[in-house]
Each structure stands twice: as C-alpha cells, then as structure tokens.
C-alpha cells in the first residue's frame, strides 16, 4: 500500500485530505452536498467515491428518462444495476437511445460541477449477456 501511495502522490494527498476532513468534522460531504456518515476512517475515501458514482448514475438516469419522455421514444427501462442501465428499445432507435444515454452521463459533469470528464458507452443486443 505504501509503495502504491508513493507512486501516486495525488491519491495519497486525496486520502490524507479525506482522513483529515473526517477527523475534523466527523463526516464528509457528497458531491450533492449531503452529509456522508463515516463508520470507519479507513473506509472514508471509498464512501466518498461510491457516493459520487451512485449520484452520477442516478442523475444520468433522470436525464435520460426526461429525454425519452420529451421525445416520446418507444422504450422502457427494465433494469438499473449499480452503474448500468438496461433498456428495452425498438431496434430502429436503439443506436439513437444509446447515444442519448451516453449524453445523459456526460451532462452530469456540469450538473455536479465535476472536474473529471464523465463518459459512458452503450451496447445493443438481444439480451443482458449481449449488452453487459
């Protein structure tokens, strides 16, 4: 672990800053401003990262849902698993909806004023195995 942190000084600094924040405040703030309770200092950075990932995907899902409704697209969300959306879509609009899904993920970057570029990908197939 020490070798990894030595070779990635930005992560080491982030880890130190997160631990200091937990020590001073007793909690962290998520990218949406909510309080993140920290059960143990060693899990603080993971809590921050997992919270951000969950919020990004949920907001992207909202953006995509709004676009689907706005354009009256014939498709249904059939599963939402961690960082993955599964949609049942007519074949003739599958590529278009996939592009809209990626754009929805990208749009969350400015929504949360996120400094890291956000992107996604989509796959078209007949079942979950084809698209996972």
Regions picked out by a protein language model, each given a short descriptive name:
Residues 1-132:
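Conserved catalytic core of nucleotide polymerization and phosphodiester-bond processing enzymes
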């Amino acid at each position: 672990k020490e070798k990894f942190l030595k070779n990635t000084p930005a992560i080491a600094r982030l880890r130190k800053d997160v631990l200091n924040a937990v020590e001073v405040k007793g909690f962290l703030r998520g990218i949406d401003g909510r309080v993140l309770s920290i059960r143990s200092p060693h899990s603080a950075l993971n809590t921050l990262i997992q919270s951000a990932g969950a919020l990004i995907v949920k907001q992207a899902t909202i953006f995509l849902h709004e676009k689907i409704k706005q354009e009256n697209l014939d498709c249904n969300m059939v599963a939402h698993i961690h960082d993955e959306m599964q949609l049942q879509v007519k074949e003739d609009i599958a590529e278009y909806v996939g592009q809209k899904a990626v754009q929805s993920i990208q749009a969350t970057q400015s929504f949360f004023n996120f400094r890291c570029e956000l992107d996604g990908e989509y796959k078209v197939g007949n079942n979950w195995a084809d698209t996972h």
